[in-house]
C-alpha cells in the first residue's frame, strides 16, 4: 500500500520562497518515483488538474489558491555521481546549491555557478536556469519525464529547444523526473574554492535572506534588467507589502505580508516605467499559478 499523504486545503504560502499563496485544493509531496506515479494515476482517476510547484521558487501563486492537485517536489531527491566519467544522475527535486556542492566535492567542474540559485533541478531544466554566462542546458545530456497520463519519456538535451530562460518544456504538460548531466573533471579543492566564492558574491549582492522568488525579470540582452530598474531610482519602491530590493533591483521581496496582487501590481508598474523610459518591454521569469 502506498504511504504518500494527499492533503486537502493546505496553505501554499508555506510552500513558496515568496511566502505567498492561497490554499491548495489538494497537495502531494512524493519522495520517490513510485509515489509520483501513484499521485499522477490518482489525478487521472479523479479527473482533476495537476500543477507542479517544485520547491516553490520562481513562482507566484494566487491568494485564492489553486484548484486540483499541487505537486510539491521538494522531497523528491537523489543524486548519483560517477566521478570517472563525469556523469551525474539527479532527481528533479534536488536543489541546485546541493548539487553544486556535491559536484565540487567530487572534483567535477562546470556547476559552480549554480551554488546560490534557490531552485530545483527540474525547475532549472524547464527554465534553462543560469548565471555568470552559464546555463544548465550546456551540461544536460538528457532528462526523463512523466506525462500527466502516466507515460515516461527520455528526451535528449539537444531536443529541448533551449534558449535564454526558455525550453520546449514550458509549453508541454510534462513533469521532469530526473536529469543526466555531464561535467568535466578538475581539482576538487580549486572547484570548491570557486563555488564558495560564487556563494559569497551572491550573499553580498542579492537579498539572500529575504523572502523572494529569485530574479523576477528576464534580461533584455545584452542589457541587464536590474540596471534599467536601478537607473529609474526604483530600489526600495513598494506596493503594499511587496518591495523592490534595496540590494538588487531585479528581486521583489515580501517585505510585509505581501499579497499576490501586491506583487503583480509592482511588476506591472516596473514594466510600465521601463517601457516609458527606454522603450523596452521587460518579460518576467516568474511562473504564475491560479490566476
UniProtKB/Swiss-Prot annotation:
Swiss-Prot/TrEMBL catalytic activity: UDP-N-acetyl-alpha-D-muramate + NADP(+) = UDP-N-acetyl-3-O-(1-carboxyvinyl)-alpha-D-glucosamine + NADPH + H(+)
Ranges in coiled-coil conformation: none
GO terms under cellular component: cytosol
This enzyme's EC code(s): 1.3.1.98
Chief location category: cytoplasm
Residues the record marks as active site: 165, 215 (proton donor), 285
Domain of life (superkingdom): Bacteria
Listed pathway(s): Cell wall biogenesis; peptidoglycan biosynthesis
GO molecular function annotation: FAD binding; UDP-N-acetylmuramate dehydrogenase activity
Cofactor(s) the record lists: FAD
InterPro entries attached to this UniProt entry: FAD-bd_PCMH, FAD-bd_PCMH-like_sf, FAD-bd_PCMH_sub1, FAD-bd_PCMH_sub2, MurB, MurB_C, MurB_C_sf, Oxid_FAD_bind_N
Annotated compartments: Cytoplasm
GO biological process, one term: cell division
Domain FAD-binding PCMH-type: 19-186
Keywords: Cell cycle, Cell division, Cell shape, Cell wall biogenesis/degradation, Cytoplasm, FAD, Flavoprotein, NADP, Oxidoreductase, Peptidoglycan synthesis
Its job: Cell wall formation.
Similarity section: Belongs to the MurB family.
This protein's name: UDP-N-acetylenolpyruvoylglucosamine reductase
Gene behind the chain: murB
Amino acid at each position: 500500500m502506498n504511504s504518500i499523504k494527499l492533503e486537502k486545503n493546505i496553505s501554499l504560502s508555506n510552500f513558496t520562497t515568496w511566502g505567498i499563496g492561497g490554499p491548495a485544493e489538494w497537495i502531494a509531496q512524493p519522495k520517490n518515483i513510485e509515489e509520483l506515479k501513484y499521485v499522477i494515476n490518482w489525478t487521472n482517476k479523479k479527473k482533476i488538474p495537476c500543477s507542479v510547484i517544485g520547491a516553490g521558487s520562481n513562482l507566484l501563486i494566487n491568494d485564492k489558491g489553486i484548484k486540483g492537485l499541487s505537486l510539491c517536489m521538494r522531497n523528491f531527491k537523489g543524486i548519483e555521481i560517477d566521478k570517472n566519467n563525469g556523469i551525474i544522475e539527479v532527481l528533479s527535486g534536488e536543489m541546485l546549491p546541493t548539487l553544486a556542492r556535491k559536484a565540487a566535492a567530487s572534483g567535477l567542474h562546470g556547476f559552480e555557478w549554480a551554488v546560490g540559485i534557490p531552485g530545483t533541478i527540474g525547475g532549472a531544466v524547464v527554465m534553462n536556469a543560469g548565471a555568470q554566462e552559464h546555463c544548465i542546458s550546456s551540461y544536460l545530456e538528457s532528462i526523463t519525464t512523466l506525462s500527466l497520463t502516466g507515460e515516461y519519456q527520455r528526451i535528449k538535451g539537444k531536443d529541448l529547444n533551449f534558449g535564454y530562460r526558455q525550453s520546449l518544456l514550458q509549453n508541454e504538460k510534462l513533469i521532469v523526473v530526473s536529469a543526466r548531466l555531464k561535467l568535466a573533471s578538475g581539482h576538487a579543492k580549486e572547484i570548491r574554492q570557486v563555488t564558495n566564492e560564487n556563494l559569497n558574491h551572491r550573499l553580498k549582492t542579492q537579498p539572500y535572506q529575504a523572502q523572494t522568488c529569485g530574479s523576477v525579470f528576464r534580461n533584455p540582452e545584452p542589457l541587464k534588467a536590474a540596471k534599467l530598474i536601478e537607473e529609474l531610482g526604483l530600489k526600495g519602491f513598494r506596493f503594499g507589502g511587496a518591495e523592490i530590493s534595496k540590494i538588487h533591483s531585479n528581486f521583489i521581496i515580501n517585505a510585509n505580508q505581501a499579497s499576490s496582487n501586491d506583487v503583480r501590481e509592482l511588476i506591472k508598474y516596473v514594466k510600465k516605467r521601463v517601457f516609458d523610459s527606454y522603450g523596452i518591454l521587460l518579460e518576467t521569469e516568474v511562473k504564475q499559478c491560479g490566476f
